[in-house]
Amino acid sequence: MAANVSNDNNQLLHTCFHLPDPFFQQVQHRYQSNLITGVINAIFAPFSATANSLVFLAILLSASLRSAPSCLLIACLALSDFLVSVIVQPSYVAYRFNENLHGYVNCAVRVLYANGFYVCYGVSFMTLSAISFERYLALRLHLRYEGLVTVRRILLVAMLIWFLNIALTSLQ
């Protein structure tokens, strides 16, 4: 009976919310790939953060770019990619290096990486889809495009994209 309670407590300590338990027993097989991908992400994250923040600020500070619906979607994409470079990539590096060094990854790192990944990459994918659809409308509708695709509607679409991804991630 006492052993059963102890096993239940150990299982509760090792669960990490909605995330499945990773298989750290095979860490030796992934050691080199973890090291390489961790180093690559650590090198490129600052460049990505800088580039995406410059794109976002350029659109935000320029009145002519802010008034173009397609530029607002690009700003939404730049914001999402900026968050990838400051949240997802560093947590990925921490995840892989902890896996290599300790054979275990803290639950907070796993949750930050997984939820940041789901939200940011979901937003990126949906924003790219919205950009494609907006460009299709620009080609297809010609003269009616400016009346149909407005800055206000694009902002609503961008807010809906963020809301949907955050809501769907939090439902897990």
Residue positions per predicted region:
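C-terminal TM-helix exit segments that contain a strictly Trp-centered aromatic cap at the helix terminus
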Residues: I87-S91, A167-Q172
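Extracellular N-terminal segment of 7TM GPCRs
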Residues: M1-L54
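Class A GPCR helix-loop hinge within the 7TM core
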Residues: V119-M159
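Extracellular TM2-ECL1-early TM3 structural module of rhodopsin-like
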Residues: R30-P46, A68-I131, A138
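Generic alpha-helical transmembrane segments of integral inner-membrane proteins
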Residues: P46, T50-S53, V86, M159, ...
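Alpha-helical transmembrane segments of integral membrane proteins, especially early/N-terminal helices
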Residues: M1-L13, A75-I87, W162
